[in-house]
Amino acid sequence: MRADLDAFLEHLRSERQVSAHTLDGYQRDLLKILALAEKAGLTDWNALDTRTLRTFVARLHQQGQSSRSLARLLSATRGFYQYLLREGRCRHDPANGLSAPKSPRKLPRTLDADRALQLLDGAVEDDFIARRDQALLELFYSSGLRLSELVGLDLEWLDLKEGLVRVRGKGNKVRELPVGKAARQALEAWLPLRAQATPEDGAVFIGRGGKRLTPRAVQLRVRQAGVRELGQHLHPHMLRHSFASHLLESSGDLRAVQELLGHADIATTQIYTHLDFQHLASVYDRAHPRAKRKGNADGGNDP
């Protein structure tokens, strides 16, 4: 059974050319399914039935696994079984028709515009680390990059003269994004210092030794900046969420925000409309004459 799993992972890597992050996710989820099958005494994938898989998913949910994680596990299982069916290694898909337990969708955490400016407008020392960190923070917020997109960014994809950056997002899709003035200036201040560090390759963001920054290193730098400037923990995706929320709030153009974020489905982008409504409701509560009378004991029972 492990041989079939390894063959599928190699198929994903070499033929479908999925990212290392995606491949790790598939492997992690499918190893859980393999452990389930072995614990049940199964000797081939055809013996795993829908009832056993449903019970396993329910148990994981009771143990605290999120609906999102379980949906990903079922998706990986379906992909694996579709591969087995094509290869003639199996006659059915036990995950077909199964869905993860639903849970309320959490709204993404964002910074309000004033807090974003507070994070980015502080004094920046003219040294390697400070200039690099300022550039990556500005680019996250200016262009709404994912962490993987920023870490994977190479110089050849950056056009500061035109104020554009190209990134390779999910599904290997390339999109072109604008780079705002503040981010351009931060990058222009950073790149000469980068060149002095003898970079190993074309990575835009590197450490002192010239190596490309890892996702973990960027997460730590963003977190430290949040604590230092705002007194709160901050993660890269919060800057991406803030970019999307502030842009939608100002423009109202959901399709444009979808394109900039690289979402394949506009339903994914629509979560930011809920954030925008929260902002509008807050403004209403503060500014509308009738709203301000709520809870006012002197309001009486006006006709």
UniProtKB/Swiss-Prot annotation:
Subcellular location per the Swiss-Prot or TrEMBL entry: Cytoplasm
Core-binding (CB) domain mapped to chain residues: 1-85
Swiss-Prot/TrEMBL keywords: Cell cycle, Cell division, Chromosome partition, Cytoplasm, DNA integration, DNA recombination, DNA-binding
Gene Ontology biological-process entries: cell division; chromosome segregation; DNA transposition
One GO location term (cellular component): cytoplasm
Record's function text: Site-specific tyrosine recombinase, which acts by catalyzing the cutting and rejoining of the recombining DNA molecules. The XerC-XerD complex is essential to convert dimers of the bacterial chromosome into monomers to permit their segregation at cell division. It also contributes to the segregational stability of plasmids.
Record-given protein name: Tyrosine recombinase XerC
